[in-house]
Amino acid sequence: MPSRLRRIYGLRDFHFITCSCYRRQPLLGTRHAREVFLRIFEQVRRKYKFEVVGYVVMPEHFHILIAEPEKGNPSTVLQVLKQSVAHRLLKPSRKRRSNQPMLWRDDGTGQHRHFWQPRFYDFNVYSNEKRAEKLRYMHENPVNRGLVPSPELWRWSSFRAYFCEEASVVRIDELDAIPKRKPNLK
């Protein structure tokens, strides 16, 4: 069994967190699923009182860049976020349609649904340079994957809040820390 990543909390670092959907299936591949994710992410942000520097929601994973929460720790935040999103998005799919990704497995005790991979990747962001690097990585992710030709066209990231001055469902706390660039809205 692979060793667990060591999580370091309590240093007041920012955390770059990546979490994947079960078996990398595109369970966040619809507009509805991504919007549900963002609404729940904002609710969790308010409940656990943490700053959000940036985020991107991709079809089969997400990245968030957050400060350590006032309540709990990043693991607690991820547990609540993942459970809430899975509960909300799996609830209407009690019966699987033929075009819906497989979310069920039988482990001998009955049917169990899966939405997320069991673990997540957490990288402590220890400098302003690393924070800017991770933010750029998130904003460029949809472009690098070929989902859109430019980051401002992907509506499920913090890019538009930073560079297009568009309100985000999720409150972004570091808007003034990143230099503005002219968006390429085509």
Tell what function each PLM region has.
Residues M1-K186:
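Short catalytic/metal-binding and nucleic-acid-binding patches
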